[in-house]
A protein has these predicted regions:
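Aromatic/hydrophobic pocket-lining residues that form π-stacking "cages" and hydrophobic walls in ligand
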Residues: 42, 81, 108, 133-134
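Nucleotide donor/acceptor-binding cores
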Residues: 2-4, 117, 144-147
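Short active-site oxyanion
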Residues: 29-33, 67-69, 175-176
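Short acidic low-complexity segments
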Residues: 52-64
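Beta-strand-loop-alpha-helix segment that lines the small-molecule cofactor/substrate pocket
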Residues: 68, 74-75, 79-126, 141
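Predominantly a Rossmann-like dinucleotide-binding segment in NAD(P)-dependent oxidoreductases
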Residues: 125-205
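N-terminal Rossmann-like dinucleotide-binding module
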Residues: 1-48
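Short, well-ordered coil/turn residues at beta-beta hairpins
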Residues: 72-73, 192
Length: 205
């Protein structure tokens, strides 16, 4: 069986767990090139992982042997990069969130649909064994009908995470902790309880 051939765009903080997984999957996936506009980040990545480095995104996208692109850049760049990837006929696995606004996110989805490429989003918590087992249990109906759902987000990042320039800003990330960490819990809730029918809120004073 031939291996899936991919390119990586973005060699910042998010790339490490992906690269570790790709090392384990080398029998199934070949990394054709790992791109960053930063020579420093390319060098740091190359010192840690056995994948070819690339300093020209256009050249990587022009490579007809590349099947898909793994996009790990800040959220405010997603639409523009997705346009380029989709325009080159590459399927896309995109780090969450889609982009920083609803309008940009909808345009990104429409762009991929128009180009006939598959778009996937990195929201991995729904695939954890416990989440899969719970989803199957809920789907069986043994617990009855879900009529409401609430969640508590228990995630933490050190200050060094937020020291990265622009981290948690509306301009780069589209918001703070809800989009950077809380999105995983919200996605897990959706995967277990189904689409949202109604949203309510309250504030304590």
């Amino acid at each position: 069986m031939s291996r899936l051939r991919i390119g990586i765009v973005g060699l910042g903080m998010a790339v490490t767990p992906h690269a570790r997984g790709l090392v384990d999957l080398q029998d199934e996936i070949e990394v054709v090139g790992a791109y960053s506009p930063s020579a420093e980040r390319r060098a740091a990545f190359g010192a840690r992982f056995p994948f070819p480095l690339c300093d020209d995104l256009d050249a990587l996208l022009a490579d007809e042997s590349v099947d898909a692109m793994l996009v790990l850049t800040p959220a405010n760049t997603h639409l523009d990069i997705a346009r380029r990837c989709a325009g080159a006929g590459k399927h896309i696995l995109l780090e969450k969130p889609l982009d920083i606004t609803t309008a940009r996110s909808q345009e990104l989805v429409a762009t991929c649909r128009a180009a006939g490429v598959t778009l996937g989003i990195v929201l991995q918590h729904r695939f954890k064994p416990a989440a899969v087992a719970l989803a199957e249990h809920l789907a069986s109906g043994r617990m009855g009908e879900i009529v409401g759902c609430s969640t508590v987000i228990r995630l933490w990042r050190p200050q060094s995470y937020y020291d990265e320039p622009g981290r948690g800003s509306f301009a780069r990330d589209g918001g703070g902790v809800l989009l950077s960490q809380g999105i995983h819990t919200l996605d897990l809730m959706l995967s277990l309880a189904g689409p949202i029918a109604e949203v309510g809120g309250y504030a304590l004073t």
